Each structure stands twice: as structure tokens, then as C-alpha cells.
UniProtKB/Swiss-Prot annotation:
GO molecular function annotation: calcium ion binding
Family stated for the protein in its record: Belongs to the MukF family.
NCBIfam families assigned to the protein according to its UniProt record, in alphabetical order: PRK05260.1 (NF003615)
Regions crossing the membrane: none
UniProt-listed GO biological process terms: cell division; chromosome condensation; chromosome segregation; DNA replication
Function: Involved in chromosome condensation, segregation and cell cycle progression. May participate in facilitating chromosome segregation by condensation DNA from both sides of a centrally located replisome during cell division. Not required for mini-F plasmid partitioning. Probably acts via its interaction with MukB and MukE. Overexpression results in anucleate cells. It has a calcium binding activity.
Gene Ontology cellular component annotations, sorted alphabetically: cytoplasm; nucleoid
Quaternary data: Interacts, and probably forms a ternary complex, with MukE and MukB via its C-terminal region. The complex formation is stimulated by calcium or magnesium. It is required for an interaction between MukE and MukB.
Entry-linked InterPro entries: Chromosome_partition_MukF, MukF_C, MukF_C_sf, MukF_M, MukF_M_sp, MukF_WHTH, WH-like_DNA-bd_sf, WH_DNA-bd_sf
Name recorded for this polypeptide: Chromosome partition protein MukF
Cellular localisation: Cytoplasm, Nucleoid
A matching Pfam family: MukF_C
Protein's UniProt keywords contain Transmembrane helix: no
Protein species of origin: Salmonella typhi
Length: 440
């Protein structure tokens, strides 16, 4: 988790003093990516100047640049990379003229973004979440044990700061890369549809389904581990409440909770936005198919009329008897003439008319729990009420019962952050998820 100890003026003055600047045209960026790729194949992580020149030659050939000045241009590119702190140059008096080059952290960061981080891996994300879960559990256990300031710094603050926070940042970066990939997929689909939408339909479907699957896979993985991570963070937060000197731990835990909530929330929002775009593309394709179908028919009809004398044709048509609707749409339906009088047991009474009466009865019956200070299990209570009503009324009755119940009090288990178990409330598959109300 990024924290800046310097102020904005201090950072600006520091950047100006060190003359930081980055300029990477497409050919220089390609050269840097080539260097990073070749560097990754070496165990020592070092490259000679000759190897850098060879990498530059490959890039120059790909851009169809002249080979006559390859040495000068390669030397200029290498010096430019060193000046921008993308490469470090090491020289030795024993081997003068044979410098050794290593990628700087800045160079690794840029190339890592363009190369390694471009590939989404569910296994990688699962391993990251597994590591985070283990670190958080150990930190929560250490917080529960308690100890001196050194104990809190070493066993609680350090794992949260330098392991959990960094992995959260990595997951956040993965989400942001997925945002870019979504935009790239949208651009690809737009180009395909502009060229030849009939031939592009299958490609569009593939791009849409792959992106939807990746987003859903990412979100499912996050949600599966999210509850456990939040539970351990809450354990650490509870342990710090009795210590006035642990504000730094409490602040870090709060930042981690906010980061985790933001990651999971944006994952679901990203899926919802993509679903909307998916529907928009399919609607466009259906509209294009309908328009193209009508346009082709009209074009063929015009050609047939124009070439009739050269190529005569006969038109055969079928005229089926029309089905007439004898019902008068304007006729008003009168109960006394059409349906007659109904027995009292079958008289219809709108549910809205008895809603207030039913709510008052349920409120009076539920008040007994508050008077006796008895825990109220919503799952059991709702099931008992629904058994008294037909299936068509279950949704409305359940809503009234829940509305009246939550007015009585709250469930202390809600403050733990742990989800309640799903309980069946009727025989038709309906379920409710709620903790037992025990505080009125």
C-alpha cells in the first residue's frame, strides 16, 4: 500500500533536482522490451554492450530502419536508456570498453507492466490470496496473544505492511490491467464490426465470452477469500482497541479493509458494466442483421423488376382466410352481467387493502419477543408465517414480517462481519439470510 511521507513540494523539488524525465517512443520502448526479454533468459541478469547492440539490430530490422548507422544509433539508444535511469552501466579498469548493463528498478517496472502483468492467471491470483490469508491469520493470532511494542511491530505491523499490503496492491494492479484489456477488446470489436460485421460475429462472440469469463473468474476468486480476509482484519482491529499506543496498526488495518472493499466492489461493478456492453453489442448485431436482411430483399426485388424482359419470372402468392377477432376491445367488462354474484368465500379482496391490517397484526405478535427479551430467529418466524398463507402471497408476507422484525432491534452477530447462514422459509426453494435478532 503506497504511503508518501514527503509532501508535494518536497517531491517536486526532489524530481527537479535529480532531473528525472522519461521519453520512450515506440522504437525505444520496443528496444527496452527486447532487452528485458533477453535479460530474463540469463541467470546472472547481466548483459554486455554487444548483446544490447544485437537486440537493437532486431528492433531496427522490425521497424525497417537502415542498417548502415546501426552502431551509432544503438550507442545513442543505450546512452539514452542510461541517462533516463532505465539501465545501469558498470565499467571496469581491467576490461575497459566492455561495460556490463543491468536493468534498473524503473526499467523492470515498465517492462513488467508491458510483458508479465499482461497475462491474467487465476492460479497466480489464488496463490496470492492464499499467501495473504496465511499472513493475516498469523498476524491476527499474534495480535490476540498481545505483547510489547516490538512484538506488535515485528509480528503484526510488518507482515501487514510489507506482505499483505503489497499483494493487495498487486491485485489492484491486476484489476486495472483488466480495465485496459476491456477497452482494448471494445476497440477490437468496433474495428471488426466496421469492416465486415457478418464475418466478425464469431470473433466478437469469442472476445465477449472470453472477457466475461475472465472477469467472473477473477471476481469469484476474490469473493471466495474476501470473508476470511475481512474476519482476520476485524480480529486484529478488536485486539488494538484496548491499546492506546497502537494507532499505527489500527490505521493500517483500516486502510487494508478499505482497499479490500474497493477491490471486491470494483470487481462486481466491472462485471455489471461489461454485461451492459455485451447486451449493447448483441442488440447492434441483431439490428444490423434485420436491416441487412430487408436491404438484400429490396435489392433483389429491384434487380428482378429491371431485368424482367430479359429474364421473365412469375409471381405466385397465397392468400389465406383471415382470422377475425370478434371481441370488442372497447367493451367494458361488468361483473353483474358476465360473472354474476360470487359466494362470500370466493370474493376477491386486493392484498393492498389488507396490508396495513396484516402489518399491524404481525407487529403486535412480534412485539412479544421484545417484551420478553427473547432472541428472534427470522428464518423460523418467517417460515411459520408463510405456512399460513398461499404461495402467491409468500413474497409480500415475508417482506412485511422482515420489515416489522428489523424495527424491533439488531443482531449483534452483524458486527462481526461474518455472513449468516441461508435458511429455507418455504417448501418452494425460498431462503433468507439473517442473524438472530438479540439486541432490542
Amino acid at each position: 500500500m503506497s504511503e508518501f511521507s514527503q509532501t508535494v513540494p518536497e517531491l517536486v523539488a526532489w524530481a527537479r533536482k535529480n532531473d528525472f524525465s522519461i521519453s520512450l517512443p515506440v522504437d525505444r520502448l520496443s528496444f527496452l522490451l527486447a532487452v528485458a526479454t533477453l535479460n530474463g533468459e540469463r541467470l546472472d541478469g547481466e548483459m554486455s554492450e554487444g548483446e544490447l547492440v544485437d537486440a537493437f539490430r532486431h528492433v531496427s530490422d522490425a521497424f525497417e530502419q537502415t542498417s548502415e548507422t546501426i552502431g551509432v544509433r544503438a550507442n545513442n539508444a543505450i546512452n539514452d536508456m542510461v541517462r533516463q535511469r532505465l539501465l545501469n552501466r558498470f565499467t571496469s579498469e581491467q576490461a575497459e570498453g566492455n561495460a556490463i548493463y543491468r536493468l534498473t528498478p524503473l526499467g523492470i517496472g515498465i517492462t513488467d507492466y508491458y510483458i508479465r502483468q499482461r497475462e491474467f492467471s487465476t492460479l497466480r491470483l489464488s496463490m496470492q490470496l492464499s499467501i495473504v490469508a496465511g499472513e493475516l491469520k498469523r498476524a491476527a493470532d499474534a495480535a490476540a496473544e498481545g505483547g510489547d511494542e516490538f512484538h506488535w511491530h515485528r509480528n503484526v505491523y510488518a507482515p501487514l505492511k510489507y506482505s499483505v499490503a503489497e499483494i493487495f496492491d498487486s491485485i489492484d494492479l491486476t484489476q486495472r490491467i483488466m480495465d485496459e484489456q476491456q477497452q482494448q477488446v471494445k476497440d477490437d470489436i468496433a474495428q471488426l464490426l466496421n469492416k465486415d460485421w457478418r464475418a466478425a460475429i464469431s470473433s466478437c462472440e469469442l472476445l465477449l465470452s472470453e472477457t466475461s469469463g475472465t472477469l467472473r473468474e477473477l471476481q469469484d476468486t476474490l469473493e471466495a477469500a474476501g470473508d476470511k480476509l475481512q474476519a482476520n482484519l476485524l480480529r486484529i482491529q478488536d485486539a488494538t482497541m484496548t491499546h492506546d499506543d497502537l494507532h499505527f496498526v489500527d490505521r493500517l488495518v483500516f486502510d487494508l479493509q478499505s482497499k479490500l472493499d474497493r477491490i471486491i466492489s470494483w470487481g462486481q461493478q466491472s462485471i455489471d458494466l461489461w454485461i451492459g456492453y455485451d447486451r449493447h453489442v448483441h442488440k447492434f448485431i441483431r439490428t444490423a442483421i434485420d436491416m441487412d436482411k430487408n436491404r438484400i430483399f429490396a435489392q433483389r426485388l429491384r434487380q428482378s423488376v429491371q431485368t424482367y424482359f430479359d429474364d421473365p419470372w412469375a409471381l405466385t402468392y397465397a392468400n389465406a382466410d383471415r382470422l377475425l377477432d370478434m371481441r370488442d376491445e372497447e367493451m367494458a367488462l361488468r361483473d353483474d352481467e358476465v360473472t354474476g354474484e360470487l359466494p362470500p368465500d370466493l370474493e376477491y379482496e386486493e392484498f393492498n387493502e389488507i396490508r396495513e391490517q396484516l402489518a399491524a397484526i404481525i407487529e403486535e405478535q412480534l412485539a412479544i419477543y421484545k417484551t420478553r427479551q427473547t432472541p428472534l430467529d427470522l428464518g423460523l418466524v418467517v417460515r411459520e408465517y408463510l405456512a399460513q398463507y398461499p404461495r402467491a402471497r409468500h413474497f409480500d408476507v415475508a417482506r412485511i414480517v422482515i420489515d416489522q422484525a428489523v424495527r424491533l432491534g439488531v443482531a449483534q452477530a452483524d458486527f462481526t462481519g461474518l455472513p449468516a447462514k441461508w435458511q429455507p422459509i418455504n417448501d418452494y426453494g425460498a431462503k433468507v439470510q439473517a442473524h438472530v435478532i438479540d439486541k432490542y
